[in-house]
């Protein structure tokens, strides 16, 4: 957890220092920082400092990862040239609603258990169903945008960047699906498992997509 946090923060610093300002850079930076924040939150959950720390860390972690699929949709729109597209505003607004729920609703997260390799977050059955639909729905929407818009792109840079965004999304979506298929009981740990695999996504964002879509300093 802490190693992944350090790597993702290092990638964020690298992107901030090396890539010239652009909307794509800002989205990638936000994604990297939020990924790192979730890893840090898991670290504090596993530290078992106090019930308050565990609850606060769980809430902060969930608020962080809630924005990731929305940023994925926004990044796909941005790379494909659909600046200020209505879908970007809609998914970010939806993400904000979920973040407020996880941050302030008393019963948003019932319990958080550290197993060593990952953290199990216990939500209510309804919250799990709604949140899973939101999260995986946006991931598949990102892949759909990548597929459709990459076929329309005349720019090789944009087309390749969209392809890499699709690869990056699948790099954590597919392994998580395989883990769940093999170990169905891992359902409550999916956020933790997914963000563990997402380090591959972070590397693709920092070293491939960011340099291709924005000039380096």
Residue ranges with predicted function:
Residues 7-10, 170:
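Glycine/proline-rich, flexible active-site/cofactor-binding loop segments
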Residues 113-129:
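Juxtamembrane membrane-water interface segments that cap and precede transmembrane helices
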Residues 1-8, 19-107, 125-140, 188-203:
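Individual alpha-helical transmembrane segments in multi-pass integral membrane proteins
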Residues 13-20, 77-87, 145-163, 209-217:
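Juxtamembrane membrane-water interface segments of multi-pass membrane proteins
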Residues 12-13, 43, 75, 173, ...:
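Alpha-helical transmembrane segments of multipass membrane proteins
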Residues 144-145, 175:
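Amphipathic, well-packed alpha-helical segments that form the structural scaffold of globular domains
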Residues 158-217:
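Interfacial "cap-and-anchor" motif at the non-cytosolic start of specific transmembrane alpha-helices
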């Amino acid at each position: 957890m802490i190693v992944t946090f350090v790597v993702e923060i290092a990638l964020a610093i690298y992107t901030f220092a090396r890539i010239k300002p652009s909307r794509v850079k800002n989205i990638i930076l936000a994604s990297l920082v939020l990924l790192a924040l979730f890893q840090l939150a898991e670290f504090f959950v596993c530290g078992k400092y106090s019930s308050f720390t565990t609850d606060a860390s769980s809430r902060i972690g969930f608020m962080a990862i809630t924005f990731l699929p929305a940023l994925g949709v926004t990044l796909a729109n941005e790379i494909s040239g659909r600046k200020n597209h209505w879908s970007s505003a809609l998914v970010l607004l939806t993400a904000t609603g979920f973040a407020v729920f996880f941050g302030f609703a008393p019963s948003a997260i019932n319990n958080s258990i550290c197993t060593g390799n990952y953290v199990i977050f216990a939500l209510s059955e309804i919250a799990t169903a709604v949140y899973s639909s939101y999260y995986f729905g946006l991931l598949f929407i990102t892949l759909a945008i990548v597929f459709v818009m990459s076929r329309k792109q005349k720019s090789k840079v944009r087309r390749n960047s969209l392809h890499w965004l699709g690869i990056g999304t699948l790099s954590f979506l597919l392994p998580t699906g395989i883990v769940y298929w093999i170990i169905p009981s891992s359902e409550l740990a999916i956020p933790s498992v997914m963000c563990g695999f997402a380090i591959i996504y972070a590397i693709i964002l920092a070293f491939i997509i960011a340099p291709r879509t924005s000039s380096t300093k």
